[in-house]
Amino acid sequence: MQILPIAHHNLLAQSRMYTTQCAMDNNGEVIDLLQKYKIPLFLSGHLHVQRIRKHKAEPGVADDAYGIQEIITDAMSIPPCQYGVLQWKEDGSMEYSTESVDVSVWAKRTEQENTDLLDFVGWSEHYIQKLIADQIGGVVHNVGSDVKRSMAVTYADVYIDYYAGRNIDAKGVRTSQGYTWWERNLPDSYLLKELNSMINDSDRDNNYLLLPEDTILEERYAWKKATASEASPSEAGRQ
């Protein structure tokens, strides 16, 4: 029997942008308990950002050494409106991936007339861009509409990729015209700090994980062996 724990709060600290009130207060104790029984995977939410990370007890631990994996699922209400798909296969392996809610296909199939639904991806991007443009307008008033739009598009693109757990091309973003406008017009703003935090936190993709059967079985065998060695001689003999 394999146990798959699921919780709201996070097991591991997985964001440079959100550094407080995300991981459990007693996460160290929970990690120790779950790893005692060689649990391979932990699922959580709360952060609203798609993340995957393996716990390492200390720096320098080998990449193939056991450590519980945590998948944080992003909020389906935030573009690109993803949800997670976890397949627990007959061979014992676990495969995780993400899918986006295809609102446009549903809208066409059900003959909806709302153009926002028919082009849901485009509407979602425009919605985020407008939201950021309004925030820019609230803190700076001496930039033209084209500059504001360029800044908003840059922020929105990073925002969507960040929450979706995608790898972000840091160099590409920071050499873009939109980012240049951010540095020039709002160098000390919290929005630029957030933009940089999202870029720095997105150096890899977080949308796929495969835990092969042999990995899971090895971890379970190691736990059973350790449990047997901790038991008394008579108990170990019965096992």
Tell me what each language-model feature is.
Residues 1-16, 85, 90-103:
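Conserved catalytic scaffold of divalent metal-dependent phosphoesterases
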Residues 21, 57, 86-89, 112-114:
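Generic alpha-helical propensity signal that fires on short helical segments
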